[in-house]
């Protein structure tokens, strides 16, 4: 039986102070249903970084995974752009 496609998100690392965990902020543009104005909606998720290779400010790709801890349900796949 084939596995279903997992969600992939791109965001920016805003915290790397925890062991093997990074906090990634995802910013999306959504249109207001009545006023038809675009709004920036951001959310922060904790992602598992096994090799601890991402740093503060990096642009990363994360993918949905099984629950790793109470709040971690995402896994770091790759670093798209390093911070300067």
Curated annotation (Swiss-Prot):
Task: Tell me the Gene Ontology biological-process terms attached to this UniProt entry.
Answer: translation
Source organism per entry reads Borrelia recurrentis (strain A1)
**What is a single cellular component term in the Gene Ontology annotation?**
cytosolic small ribosomal subunit
Q: What is this protein called?
A: Small ribosomal subunit protein uS17
One GO molecular function term of this record is:
structural constituent of ribosome
The answer, when asked if Transmembrane is one of the entry's keywords, is no
- What InterPro entries does this protein's entry cite? NA-bd_OB-fold, Ribosomal_uS17, Ribosomal_uS17_bact/chlr, Ribosomal_uS17_CS
Q: Which gene encodes it?
A: rpsQ
State its role. One of the primary rRNA binding proteins, it binds specifically to the 5'-end of 16S ribosomal RNA.
Instruction: Show the disulfide pairing.
Output: none
């Amino acid at each position: 039986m084939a596995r279903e496609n997992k969600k992939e998100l791109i965001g920016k690392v805003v915290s790397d102070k925890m062991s093997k965990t990074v906090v990634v902020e995802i910013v999306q543009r959504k249109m207001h249903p009545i006023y038809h104005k675009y709004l920036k909606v951001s959310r922060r998720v904790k992602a598992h970084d096994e090799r601890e290779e991402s740093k503060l400010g990096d642009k990363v790709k994360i993918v949905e995974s099984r629950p790793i801890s109470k709040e971690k349900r995402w896994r770091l796949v790759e670093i798209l752009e390093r911070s300067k």
